Amino acid sequence: MSDGTYIKRPNRPLQVYAVIFLIVLYVPVLFIPLFSFNDSIYVRFPLEGWTLKWYGELWQREPVWNALWNSVRVGVVVAVISTILGVIAARAITRYRMPGKSALVTFIMMPLVIPGIIFGVALLVLLSRMGIPLTLYTVGLGHLIVCLPFAVATLLPRFEGFDPSMEEASADLGENGWWTFWRVTFPMVFPGVVASLLLTFTISFDEFIMAFFLTGTDPTLPMYIWGQLRFPQEFPSVLALSSLILFVSFILVFLAQWIGRIGLDETKKS
Amino acid sequence: MADTTLAGKADSEADPPRRSGRLAGFLHRSETARGYLLISPTLAIMTVGIIMPFLILLVLSFWTRQGFGFDTTPTFNNYIRVWTEPIFGALLQRSFWISGIATVATVLLCYPMAYFVAFHVHRNKMLWIILMTLPFWTSYLLRIFAWKVILGYEGVINSGFMAMGWIQAPLEFLLYSQTAVIITLAHAWAAFAILPLYVSLEKIDKSLLEAATDLGDGPVARFLRVTLPLSMPGVIAACFLIFIPTTGDYVTPALLGGPDGAMIGNFIQLQFGAVNNWPMGATLSIVLMLWIAAIALVFLFLTRRAQARIT
């Protein structure tokens, strides 16, 4: 990195471009909280004045709390299961020589690229042919498919940067497989596990298209918002709810990215 | 414990009580079998969640709707309809057109940004990357909703510009149009372009750039002859990662597209919703999948060629 000479010269136009890029990236989303404090039922300029009444109204709504509770339940279960499956998948992929490994990884990563609507309708058809009613469990299954690639992608670099001789040393010193896992392997991949839990929870919490096809009578939060979008008079409270969701999501994802990467750079350096 | 080092590594996986069994013995010896055993729960979920649904979807696409049930005699009728009736072809074409434009716009706009972080950011690179990709992880629905707030008839742009006195009447082309869908898609998928572009640019050996400079190339020639060709795999990957998922997007055209901006995803949803012709919806999904597979092959071919040119 230090061998760059002329590259070190700052490039003004590029710096300006980068700043504008970041502004354009973030400003659209910031309009949601901005208007959620606006004391008017219409979402338009000029702003009428500051108020917290939309948040207060939200507080008293039973359906919002129900939807929140549904989303949290699905999110926690999906995060835990997809992270466990991600850990064992990443472990298997990095530790063992398996023929067809790259095809396997491609298969696991497929939901990243293929439009979610196809998975949504395919699962819907399967469930209805099998006579399984649509509940939060079916939403969870859909979210699991969406979250797994992210869990594996978060955990794979952890296991790749992991030196197998550490485990061998532990075994040589007399630890059995179970304790080696808990005392050597797990602590080293722990940041990846935390990052994966946070990330998959957020993805499930925010996921819409799978829930759109697989929700029964219990809506998740994004489904609740989707239902409210039809009513213009509900717009301000939807904005307030959206602001809260965005706030929580940004914090969780930032933590996930931070935790997921910091340790990784350290292991690479050493 | 005699066979502990058989695989060349001390065994840390199999638990002692199971070592006696024949199956356990086999698992212990075969790395492949152990790897697959370990990954099998993940594969089982993927099978239930992806392969089985796809098979049923494929079967359903050969059925016909009959009242509230299905006529299960296999027939190609749905496929023939998709092939012959112009509306389906037109919708597919429009979907590819919209996501194609969005893809090109996103990659062009993100390239300088990825270039900047790869070559001109020397401290806190990680923070920059997190900053650029952070919005991508948060609610897709809400990011699209934000654009509805901005582009709406009385939205941020229209009401803002009118309050400033720049325009007299709201600009109607902003909402419920293909333009709105393209802008929104380009914004929403930026992270998918940034990451592969950044990775491919970061990998470039800086000494090659210095060599080009020493041999008399100016900045423009150097970029065109060294940097751009070397980053081509990243460009292709970025195009692939944006083009494929956006062709089947549902939320953006549903919220911002209006009648002109409706895409194939909306049409598929209609078949499973209001139109209630599930077999037709299944056929459309399969056709879309086939197109995606074909396009993926093209991208694979392009990547191979770009890689071959570099090495």
Model region roles, listed by residue range:
Chain B
Residues A2-L6, S12-I56, M126, I130, ...:
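N-terminal signal-anchor/first transmembrane alpha helix
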Residues A24-H28, F76, I144-A186, V220, ...:
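Membrane-interfacial helix termini and adjacent extracytoplasmic/periplasmic loops
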Residues P53, L57-L60, L142-I144, W189, ...:
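Non-cytoplasmic
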Residues P86-F119:
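Transmembrane alpha-helix signature in integral membrane proteins
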